[in-house]
Structure formats: structure tokens, C-alpha cells
Curated annotation (Swiss-Prot):
EC nos: 3.1.1.1
Job of this protein: Catalyzes the hydrolysis of esters.
Protein name, entry field: Esterase FrsA
Catalysed reactions, as listed in the record: a carboxylic ester + H2O = an alcohol + a carboxylate + H(+)
């Protein structure tokens, strides 16, 4: 996109768009449970609608000072808010609005990328832009037009970055049963030759498929593994599909199509699930055990939160809004939403608790409000070859890296 057009698109103030936190209309949870910290989701305080996920944003490559700079601009805004108690609810696409400020930051990096003459630097600048555009769209609520524009910019920047960085990115199109096609990204390491053993990424509900570049760059590529990603239902390239009780539907379509992808060794495929992505990955472990060598999960959501209404009352509103949005239930009553969520439990579906032939690893943090140890243990104890991976909370960044190293090594063992 030409820089002039980008500026016109991004920075022309507009006041007609609904503010993100108003798109899902459900009963708000008590403010008493709003102060929460989760390693994978970040921190929820009384002053922000969104969970501020510094760990994951820094891990993805965003400078900590840049994060604080953007957050301070949002916090300092005097513009009208849909909720005056929440800093990130500025109405309209203008200074102080969450999407505006993060997209503006992304455009700065895009400008630097177009002016850089060094390939490695250009690629990194494009990747920085992609990360910031993705945060602009966070938490990717369905029907948020400005967020959807930011998602498009994130994907464009991500594809531009790959032209300059030392790996190959192929945009693949898969036909989906019932109509339509789905776009996925196949990341291939430069130090090996196709066909590659491949990790099928099953992502978290509030992230784009482009958010997992660091996972490929630092963990899978050095191990000689490719990474195949798609967006979760109702987000990005998967926006035409809502999340259903058959949560693994889209990923299953990809898995079955892999024999036709020449760069993938379809006999050496594993899956990795983040948060709700673990629901998808573990479901695949049962339904497609002949096609998967192993499944690893981190902070899985497969039963307890989905089936326990008391737990649901204890998580931030943003998280419940994301679930409602993915399920296509933005205007449902809490009772209807909680009843429907119960049907997504893999234990309720009759899967978990039954012996699964696929090797499964499940990592968890002590005192994780979304994934107790029992959640990970349920997965491990259901596998013929299960491995439980406890992760200490502090120091957070080092332990997160160590967990990913262990998971990558475990996955590599399964495909070698």
C-alpha cells in the first residue's frame, strides 16, 4: 500500500465506528475479580478493558519502551470514552483510541521499512509493523471494522517481512468442506530441504496467525521443522467461520490436505496448541491420531473453565467477550453463553478421559486462573504417552523460554 494512501486510511479521524468494548453486550463480571494476572494473557486492572499482555508483546518483538509510550498516549487522552472508568475505550478513530495509536505506531515502522536499504533491517522493520498492527486489532472482536482493517495491514506487513528475512513463507490456499477457501502460512527453515517435518499451530483465540513468528524463528526453524498456521475461526482469514463445538474443523481440513502440499512431509506432523488452541489440538489428537505424531499444549483450555460457571465469573470481561464473539453469540444472555461453552469441554464431548493413542504433552503454571494443574493432568492422563510440564511463574520470561525450548525438543523427538 502506498504510504500516502496508508496515511489517508489510518489517520483520518472518524467518529462513526463503534468502540470495541461495546460490541459484545453481556452482563459484566464483578469488579472484584478484575485484578488478575496470567502469564499468557497478561494483566487485567480496573483501568483497562483489554488485558495488557506485556510478556507476549515483548516476546513477539515489541520494545518495552514502545509499549509504555503507546499506553501512555491512550491513558492521557481527554477524548470521550464509552466507559470513563476504562482508559482504552476512547470513542472514534482519533488520538487516544486503542486502534488508532497502535496502528500509528505500526505505520511508523512501515515507513522505516520502505526507507531502509538493508535487507535484514527492512525485514525486521516490517515484522515490527506487523506486530503493532496486530496489537491494534487486539482482541479481534468480530464486527470491529477498524480492527479488521488493522488485521489486513498486519498480514500485508507480515508477508512483506518474509521477503527479506532468512526463511521462506508460502501463502497456501485450502478448500474447506461446505464451501470457501482458507489461507494459511507455511514457514520453512532455510537450513534444510523440503519436504519438512511440520508443526501445525493451533493458536489462541485473541491472536492472529502472524503472531507466532518468534515461535518459528527461535524454536522450530533451528530444529529443522516447518510451521503451518491458520487463523482461529471468526478471525482474520478465518472470519467467515464461527467457532463451533467441532472446534478442530478448519485445522482438520488442513491436516487432511497435507499429502497434496509438496513442501510438507505429511507422515511427520505434530500439533501445538496455545490456550484454546489446545482444545483444537487435543481434539485432533483423538480424531486424527493416524495423521499426528504428537500434540503439545501450553496453558490448555479443554474443560474446567468451559464447564464451570463459577470460574467464568472470575475471568476478565474481555476474555468472556472474546469467547462470545468467536461463538457468534455477541448478544446472548450469560446463561445461554455458559450453557453453550459447556458443550466445548472435551470431557463433556466424551473425548478426554478416554485413552488416546497420540502422545500428548501439557504445560501449565501453578495458580493459573484459566488453566489449573488438573486441566493439564486430564490431558496427560488421557494419553497413552503423556508428559506433564510444570512451568514456574518467576522469572517469567526465562521460564516461558525454557518451556518453549522443552516443548520444541519434545515435538522434534516425535517427528525424527
Amino acid at each position: 500500500m502506498a504510504q500516502a494512501n496508508l496515511s489517508e486510511t489510518l489517520f483520518k479521524p472518524s467518529f462513526k465506528h463503534p468502540e470495541t468494548s461495546t460490541l459484545v453486550r453481556r452482563t459484566r463480571n464483578s469488579q472484584d475479580v478484575q485484578g488478575l494476572h496470567s502469564t499468557l494473557e497478561g494483566e487485567k486492572t480496573r483501568s483497562w478493558y483489554r488485558m495488557i499482555n506485556r510478556l507476549m508483546w515483548i516476546w513477539r518483538g515489541v520494545d518495552p519502551w514502545e509499549i509504555e509510550d503507546v499506553l501512555s498516549r491512550i491513558a492521557a487522552s481527554k477524548a470521550d470514552r464509552s466507559n470513563e472508568q476504562l482508559l482504552d475505550t476512547v470513542i472514534g478513530y482519533r488520538g487516544g483510541n486503542w486502534i488508532y495509536e497502535w496502528a500509528k505506531q505500526g505505520a511508523d515502522w512501515q515507513q522505516r521499512a520502505t526507507e531502509s536499504g538493508d535487507d535484514a533491517q527492512t525485514g525486521q522493520f516490517w515484522l515490527n509493523a506487523a506486530n503493532l498492527y496486530s496489537i491494534a486489532a487486539y482482541p479481534h472482536i468480530k464486527g470491529d471494522e477498524l480492527a479488521e482493517q488493522a488485521q489486513t495491514l498486519a498480514n500485508r506487513a507480515y508477508e512483506e517481512a518474509a521477503k527479506y528475512l532468512p526463511y521462506e513463507l508460502k501463502e497456501l490456499t485450502f478448500p474447506i468442506a461446505g464451501g470457501g477457501t482458507l489461507t494459511g502460512f507455511l514457514h520453512m527453515p532455510s537450513q534444510a530441504k523440503a519436504p519438512f517435518p511440520t508443526v501445525l499451530m493451533c493458536g489462541s483465540l485473541e491472536m492472529l496467525q502472524s503472531d507466532y513468528h518468534r515461535l518459528f524463528q527461535d524454536y522450530f526453524a533451528p530444529a529443522g521443522m516447518a510451521m503451518l498456521t491458520i487463523d482461529v475461526p471468526s478471525v482474520g482469514f478465518s472470519s467467515r467461520w464461527k467457532l463451533t463445538q467441532d472446534s478442530s474443523f478448519l485445522h482438520q481440513q488442513l491436516l487432511r490436505a497435507l499429502p497434496d502440499v509438496p513442501w510438507v512431509d505429511h507422515s511427520r506432523v505434530v500439533a501445538f496448541g496455545f490456550r484454546f488452541g489446545a482444545n483444537i489440538a487435543v481434539r485432533l489428537a483423538y480424531l486424527e491420531s493416524q495423521r499426528l505424531r504428537g500434540v503439545a499444549c501450553l496453558g490448555p483450555l479443554v474443560h474446567h473453565l468451559l464447564s464451570d460457571s463459577t470460574r467464568q465469573q472470575q475471568v476478565p470481561d474481555m476474555f468472556m467477550d472474546v469467547l462470545a464473539s468467536r461463538l457468534g453469540m455477541p448478544f446472548s444472555t450469560d446463561t445461554s453463553l455458559k450453557t453453550e461453552l459447556g458443550r466445548y469441554s472435551l470431557k463433556t464431548q466424551g473425548l478426554l478421559g478416554r485413552r488416546c493413542p497420540t502422545p500428548m504433552l501439557a504445560g501449565y503454571w501453578d495458580n493459573d486462573p484459566l488453566c489449573p494443574k488438573e486441566e493439564a493432568s486430564l490431558i496427560v492422563n488421557s494419553s497413552a504417552q503423556g508428559k506433564l510440564l510444570p512451568v514456574n511463574f518467576s522469572p517469567v520470561y526465562q521460564n516461558f523460554d525454557r518451556a518453549l525450548q522443552q516443548i520444541s525438543g519434545w515435538l522434534q523427538d516425535k517427528v525424527c
